[in-house]
């Protein structure tokens, strides 16, 4: 179950990985309320996916870490897993579909992940 302590722990684990991003008001999307958008597109990988990938990988045991990680994704999750694994010294393999955006494939390769298409 998700607890406030787990949220604080995740924030601590992610403090040097995830950028603090702003909330910007979205008046055109707000009707009868104030709506804000979180600018997670400004994360190092271009999306919020790095948060979940890094946190999960940070919680692996030594035995699990020694085995490496495998992920399947067309882009954002792939980059999050590759970044997290590389920063934690864990081998990663990312399976990407044929037709995945070239930019996403190249960015994932640049994060030192082995790519299978």
Predicted features along the sequence, with ranges:
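PLP-dependent amino-acid enzyme catalytic core
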Residues: 1-115
């Amino acid at each position: 179950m998700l607890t406030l302590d787990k949220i604080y722990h995740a924030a601590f684990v992610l403090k040097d990985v995830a950028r603090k991003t702003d909330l910007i008001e979205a008046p055109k999307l707000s009707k009868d309320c104030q709506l804000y958008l979180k600018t997670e597109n400004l994360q190092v990988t271009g999306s919020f996916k790095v948060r979940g990938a890094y946190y999960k990988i940070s919680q692996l045991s030594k035995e699990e870490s020694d085995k490496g990680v495998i992920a399947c994704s067309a882009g954002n999750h792939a980059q999050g897993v590759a970044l997290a694994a590389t920063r934690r010294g864990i081998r990663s393999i990312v399976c990407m579909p044929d037709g995945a955006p070239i930019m996403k494939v190249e960015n994932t390769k640049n994060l030192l992940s082995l790519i299978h298409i």
